From Swiss-Prot:
Protein name: BURP domain-containing protein 9
InterPro entries documented for this protein: BURP, BURP_dom
Name of the gene encoding the protein in the UniProt record: BURP9
Keywords: Glycoprotein, Signal
Residue span(s) of domain BURP: 292-507
Length: 515
């Protein structure tokens, strides 16, 4: 017999609502309701097809099956066609903390809300809400953790979550055998998330702790990614700010074995670190090839196609009696960001990158590296690194906006005396001036003047170029070898310094100069 389409279910529903409202305004304590209303034509006691069905349980419900000590509420409309997938229906569940069903909702709060458009198992075109507490004990993917999902109405696919807001938060106790063992993991997608693969037009943030044990690419290391909204390609990460830091214990069989690796890309340009010649497989876009050249290219009259990167506006340089009272450590990064708030996203990234670089100053090939956070500490670094107080400071004459990649003619190139033992200090992005200083070995410094061979620009004078004389122990994956098509040890490697650097060289004493 087919269920009737009359107003009976609606009338019963309204009667129950009236009873509930009336009970709330009477002196009767703890009203008990256990009401069942079936449409006249209910054909089957199991699947409730083609009928209206309505249950209300209070806390005292003592059924020995699925609904002990809980309130449970179902509302199906007339078109409910299947008890499994609940197509073309409204369905509402609410479980108390005391829910003790042996199935999938043990010891947790679970709230589902489906709108009329719920069509199948992937919950397309619906609102969906999950909340698991830490005691959730399901054998699936949510063991011993807090997990939170929020999908908006535009959710179009349960796999890639396009055009939606999505939020994950895992606590340290996450014990799933998948990709998140013993780690904290945090995702934040904005409304513009359009693709699971490349994450264009979105903010994305990953943080892995040292205990990350996945057999993939992040073994025994700290890894930090930060993408801004302009991220345009998941492969080369051009036009983004991206930050990597690998510990020496990195054990991946790929390109980062047993080394420290530090990359920092600035938005829209291939900025740093062209000076980190011993630090692994640095990936630069094709435009970076003009950063490098050979020492022979510095001969006067030679044609040189090169570029010099832009520099930041200079920040203030503190004295030691001021800087010593300001925390300077990654463990205090929250306090530092608060102290200098409000800070832009770019500055926040720079603070983190600077702190990481200054806390991991281990270099290769005998180089020394230190950071200076004050005028006095910079002088201390210079003296301790070069072993003398007789020093000369040189600053590049490159313009703040840098030098574009064009065809230039070398007007002059003068070697700087004693530059075989030099100290290069690079201005870091920080609320006040911080220098990262290191001592590259076997170098030769040149003061260079260039004349544009294309645009008729005036003479560019006072440039500083460094040539590394021995590249035999450089990493084979360095971009210099890739772009210049040479092998380690075959030739010298040269590049210009940007305006934000200071180069220090020792000055011979009078006695040494007369010998």
């Amino acid at each position: 017999m087919k269920a009737t389409g009359g107003p009976l279910p609606l009338i019963l529903f309204l009667l129950i609502i009236i009873v509930l409202i009336t009970a709330q305004h009477t002196a009767i304590a703890k009203p008990f309701f256990s009401l069942n209303a079936f449409a006249q034509g209910q054909p089957n006691d199991k699947d409730d097809q083609n009928m209206g069905k309505f249950y209300v349980y209070n806390k005292a419900q003592t059924n020995n099956y699925a609904d002990q000590r809980m309130r449970k509420f179902y509302l199906y409309n007339k078109d409910q066609a299947n008890d499994w997938d609940d197509q073309k229906m409204e369905k509402f569940y609410l479980y108390h903390e005391g829910k003790t069903n042996d199935r999938d909702d043990q010891k947790r709060k679970n709230i589902y809300l489906y709108n009329e458009g719920h069509a199948n198992g992937d919950d397309q075109t619906m609102e969906k809400f999950y909340l698991f507490n830490k005691d959730q004990a399901k054998d699936g993917d949510d063991q011993k953790m807090g997990k939170f999902y929020l999908y908006n109405k535009d959710q179009a696919n349960d796999w890639d979550d396009q055009k939606m807001e999505r939020f994950y938060l895992y606590n340290k106790g996450h014990a799933n055998e998948g990709d998140d063992q013993t780690m904290e993991k945090f995702y934040l997608y904005n409304k513009g998330h359009a693709n699971e693969e490349d994450d264009q037009t979105m903010e994305k943030f990953y943080l892995y702790n040292k205990g990350q044990a996945k057999d993939g690419d992040d073994q025994k290391m700290e890894k930090n990614y930060l993408y801004n909204k302009d991220q345009a390609n998941d492969w080369d990460d051009q036009k983004i700010e991206k930050f990597y830091l690998y510990h020496e214990g990195k054990a991946n069989y790929r390109d980062d074995q047993n080394m420290e690796k530090f990359y920092l890309y600035k938005k829209g340009e291939e900025h740093k670190y062209i000076h980190s010649h011993g630090h692994g497989h640095v990936h630069f876009p094709e435009g970076a090839k003009d950063l490098y050249f050979f020492e022979d290219n510095l001969a006067p009259g030679s044609v040189l196609i090169t570029r010099i990167l832009s520099a930041r506006q200079s920040s203030i340089f503190l004295h030691r009696n001021n800087s010593k009272h300001i925390p300077f450590s990654m463990k205090n990064i929250t306090d530092i960001l608060t102290m200098f708030s409000p800070v832009s996203a770019t500055m926040a990234d720079g603070i983190a990158a600077t702190l990481q670089a200054c806390e991991h100053t281990g270099m290769v090939h005998g180089e020394k590296a230190k950071c200076a956070t004050s005028i006095e500490s910079l002088l201390d670094v210079v003296v301790s690194s070069l072993g003398t107080k007789l020093v000369r400071a040189l600053t590049p004459g490159a313009p703040m906006e840098g030098v574009p990649s064009l065809r230039y003619i070398v007007a002059s190139a003068t070697p700087v005396p004693n530059s075989q033992s030099m100290l290069a200090c690079h201005d870091m992005l920080y609320p006040y001036k911080v220098f990262f200083c290191h001592t590259p070995k076997q170098t030769r410094l040149y003061q260079v003047s260039l004349v544009s061979g294309e645009s008729g620009r005036p003479l560019i004078d006072g440039l500083l170029a460094v040539c590394h004389q021995n590249t035999s122990d450089w990493d084979t994956g360095h971009p210099f070898f890739h772009f210049m098509d040479v092998k380690p040890g075959e030739t010298t490697a040269c590049h210009f310094f940007g305006r934000g650097s200071i180069i220090w060289v020792p000055v011979p004493s009078v006695k040494e100069a007369t010998q």
